[in-house]
Amino acid sequence: MFTLGTSLSSQVDPNWQTYIMLVVYFVVLLVIGYYGFKQSTGNVSEYMLGGRNIGPYVTALSAGASDMSGWMIMGLPGEVYTTGLSAAWLAIGLTLGAYINYIVVAPRLRVYTEKAGDAITLPDFFKNRLDDKSNSIKIISGAIIVVFFTLYTHSGMVSGGVLFESAFGVNYHIGMLLVAVIVIAYTFFGGYLAVSLTDFFQGVVMIIAMVMVPIVAMLQLSGLDTFTQTAELKPTNLDLFKGTTVIGIISFFAWGLGYFGQPHIIVRFMSIKSVKQLPTARRFGIGWMAISLLGAVGVGLTGITFINQSGTDIENPETLFVLMGQILFHPLVGGFLLAAILAAIMSTISSQLLVTSSSLTEDFYKLIRGEEAAKEHEKEFVLVGRLSVIIVAIVSIWIAWSPNDTILGLVGNAWAGFGAAFGPLVLLSLYWKGLSRTGAVSGMLSGAIVVIIWIAFVKPLGDVNDFFNLYEIIPGFLTSLIVTVVVSKFTKKPQIDVEADLTDVRRLVKTGED
């Protein structure tokens, strides 16, 4: 157990018991992947969307685990450790955003995607919803998914490399490659079902870890007095409104806007067996999320006192969870906690790889081969989907080979890109009959471009004026929303009867019919 005043480095060397736990964890993932392979290799819909036959509990934890990547276990505790309780605005904004997403987006998207040509990707839904015979919206939205998800997956690869480097002293690149090989294996073979089932398993592992570490840390320190000691070190540590600026609080809170446009999360709503099961999924999923995020904040707060009393500096705050887990627990339990970090990392990577693979297959390859070929040669399209998983993973590894940013920063950029490009479009496509194809394309592009410009040219001016530190999703989301509405007002609407479709969708959601 932990003894105050001793060296961190003398207590964090993993032994064979830690390795055994990790090997067992990897084997479980591969077994689940094999099960998914045996169950869902028949056609593209099954491989990409589980045949729309996923239950509420798997849907909930799959959405949660694919959302709460390595940033929750490594990034958020590190941010709380650095800035104090004010970083909890991020957790508050995300929880509120996820809850609204379940209420506003999930029911209509589940019904409308099936009604609109049984769309299995977001670009496919946009195309059918807007009657886009030119396929321009499908190509552009598909390209945005491929670009931003490749960058998003890159953040997961970085997390995996950092974990193995900090926990085992393993070379960063070897650790990253090990994570990539395992994720590729079960995603390649098992498809959506394997990804969802492994996400469920990994979600259970994650919540146990996030509850366990801060509680044990408190017991090892001074119980609830730990927080008093944390405040004594710096009064702003326990002040929700200090330790950051007003712009910082707004930016943290604005992360919740991103949920409306995250393809790897909202695809979970499309795959649930029935719209009637969504309330169960919502209660279970939001409960899991709130407890996990509370635990992450707890790790950061207890870590402030924990590291201070150990008399040791921490070089990278994002390794706080790793250090606390290895010092506080028996190596076997420490291995379990490392598995929890891997669970967070790999659950997100696998979901992102599958969504990107789906987009490459459905939104690009199908356009080249044609609809008839897709129906006649489904195994060919499944194979293309699997090969796409490998290609995207390789590109992400290449980008992540030389990490030069924080995990939270990498995730934040990709999150903003998707939230701004797709968030307003998803909401308007589900609720507004006046949406046009030209408006949708203009809004998507403007949102993505504003995010990129803000990151590249505006944020570097943050030292001049704090306003420029505003999270890029806010200007990107607002720009996309305004441009979409304004352009739609002056351009041609779809030829199909959208008002009748929206009325039918409302009816189906209300009655719960499949």
From Swiss-Prot:
It catalyses: L-proline(in) + Na(+)(in) = L-proline(out) + Na(+)(out). Keywords: Amino-acid transport, Cell membrane, Ion transport, Membrane, Sodium, Sodium transport, Symport, Transmembrane, Transmembrane helix, Transport. It is found in: Cell membrane. InterPro entries: Na/Glc_symporter_sf, Na/Pro_symporter, Na/solute_symporter, Sodium:Solute_Symporter. Disulfide bonds: none annotated. The keyword Protein transport does not apply. It is a multi-pass membrane protein. The chain crosses the membrane at residues 17-37, 54-74, 85-105, 144-164, 174-194, 204-224, 246-266, 284-304, 327-347, 381-401, 407-427, 438-458, 467-487. PROSITE patterns: NA_SOLUT_SYMP_3 (PS50283). GO terms for biological process: proline transport. Its main location: membrane. It comes from the Bacteria. The keyword Zinc-finger does not apply. GO terms for cellular component: plasma membrane. Pfam families: SSF (PF00474). One of its GO terms (molecular function) is sodium ion binding. Catalyzes the sodium-dependent uptake of extracellular L-proline. Belongs to the sodium:solute symporter (SSF) (TC 2.A.21) family. PANTHER family: SODIUM/PROLINE SYMPORTER-RELATED, SODIUM_PROLINE SYMPORTER. This is Sodium/proline symporter 1. It comes from Staphylococcus saprophyticus subsp. saprophyticus (strain ATCC 15305 / DSM 20229 / NCIMB 8711 / NCTC 7292 / S-41).
